[in-house]
Amino acid sequence: MALLCMVAYASSYAHIFADAVAGSRTAYLVVLPVLALLIAAGYRTTSHGVGDGESDWIVAALIGILGLAAIYLLIGRMPTLSAWWRLESLAVLVWAVCCVIILFGMRHALTMWSLWLFLACFATPVPYLAATAALGGTPIDGAIVAAAIGAVAVFLATRTLAMRRRLAATAISLAASAPLVVNCASWFLPTIIVAAGVIPVLSVIGARLTPNSRSADPTERPISAAMPHRSVRTVGVLAVGTAILAAAGLHQHDAAAPRTIPTDWTARSGLSRIASYDFVTKFAGPDSTLVRFAAPDQKGMPAAAVDVLSTPSEAVLADLSDVVWYPAARPVSYRAVAASAGIPAGTRVLHSDADAAADARGVDWYALTWTQRAGSLFQRVTVIVSQSLSGDQAPPTPQPPDALDASVGSWLWLSRQRPQGLDHVDPLVSQRAATLTAAVSAVSDSPSPGGSHRRD
C-alpha cells in the first residue's frame, strides 16, 4: 500500500522538495510522507471480524469515485481557492483509503481513522501557514508548528503502547526539537527535516524498544493474520490506478522564470509610495514587504493604485500566488490574460462582482497581477482599479487572508448554489487597468538612464 501511494505521489513530491530547497515556507510537506508511514506502521494489529471482499471492493469504488469526482468538481468551480489549499493533494489520501480497504479490508481502514484525519489536516498547507502566521510568521514560528506536527505523529504512531509512554515519547520529541528550532531556524529546511522528521522517528523507535508492560488486547490479532488473500488481478488493478494518478501530475508547478526589471522602476513610473502593510510578514516572512503606490490620476477614469509584494525568495512568492488579498462578496478566481505589447507574460486578472455586493459600503475592484524580479527581490505587482466610475473612491487596501472565513464561507457559498453571474466589468475600468499596466511595463522594460540596467 505504501509503495502504491509513493509512486502516485512521486511527481508531486519531487516538486515539493524542489520548492522547499528554493525556500518555500511549506517545507514541512517534505517530511509529511515519513510521518504518515510512521503512523501507519503503528497499526500492527486489527480487530477480529468476518471480512467481505465484495463489499470492500464496492466501498472502495464508491469512496474513490465520489472522492476524486468531488475534488475535480471543486477545483473546476473554485480554482483559485482550491489551488491555495492544494486540494489536488487530497487525491493521494483518497487513493490511500481505497488501497487499504481493498488490501486489508474495510474494518481495518476504519481503525486507521486517526491517520486519515492527520493527513486531511496537514496534506494541504493552509492550516500550517495559518498557524505559523498566528504565531508571528518567523522561521522559528514555522519550525515550532512543524515540530508540533511531528509530535502529534509520535503520539499517533505509538497507539499500541501505554498512555504514559505515549505522552512521554511525545514530550521527548518536543523537548529534543526545541533547541534546534530556537537556534537553527535560519537553516529552515534542515531544521524542519530534523525537528519534524528525524527526531519523531527516533522518538517512536525509542518508545518501542523500551519494554512494554501493557497486556495484549485479546480482541486484536496481528495484521498479517487478518490480511485477506488478494489475487494478482487485484494488485494489477491497483497498479493501473496508481499509474493513472502518477501520470496525472497532481502538483501544479509553474516553471516560467519571471522577467527582470530595473530596481528603480517605481520611481521611473511616476508612482508615489503611500502605505505599507506589515501583516504580510506573517505570511511571507520577516524579509517581505507589501507597499501601496498611488498611480497618477486620469480625468474621467476610475481611481487606481499599484500594490507590490516583495520577498527575496521566489518560492515564498509562489506559496502565496493564489491568495486573494482584497475583500469580495463571493469567491473570486484568477484568470490568465493573453500577453501583448502592454501586458507582461503571465499576467492574471481578478475582480469582485459589483452585482453580488453584500455590503453597500464596500468598494468593488478590478486587478491585473504579474510576477517580476527587481535586483535580488522577487515581486508580485498588482494594478488594482476601483469599479466606481466617479473616481472618488480609492480601491480597497490589501487585507490579511482569513483561512477559516475565506474557506468555510466559500464552501457555504458553493453549497447554496449561488449563480456565478455575468462578471460584468465596465470597459472604463478594464481600460484604466490595462493602460496603467502598459505604462508600468513600458518603463520597466526600458533601460535606466545612463546605461542598461542590471540583470541578475
Model features per residue range: what roles?
Residues 1-17, 245-250:
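Alpha-helical transmembrane segments of multi-pass membrane proteins
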Residues 1-11, 58-69:
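Alpha-helical transmembrane segments
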Residues 134-217:
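Membrane-embedded alpha-helical segments of integral membrane proteins
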Residues 17-22, 73-85, 102-108, 128-138, ...:
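Membrane-interface helix caps and helix-loop-helix hairpins in membrane proteins
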Residues 12-25, 43-50:
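Short, hydrophobic transmembrane alpha-helix segments
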Residues 219-253:
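Internal/C-terminal transmembrane anchor helices
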Residues 19-37:
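Loop-to-helix transition at the N-terminal end of transmembrane alpha-helices
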Residues 298-455:
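A cross-kingdom signal targeting lumenal/periplasmic-facing segments of multi-pass membrane
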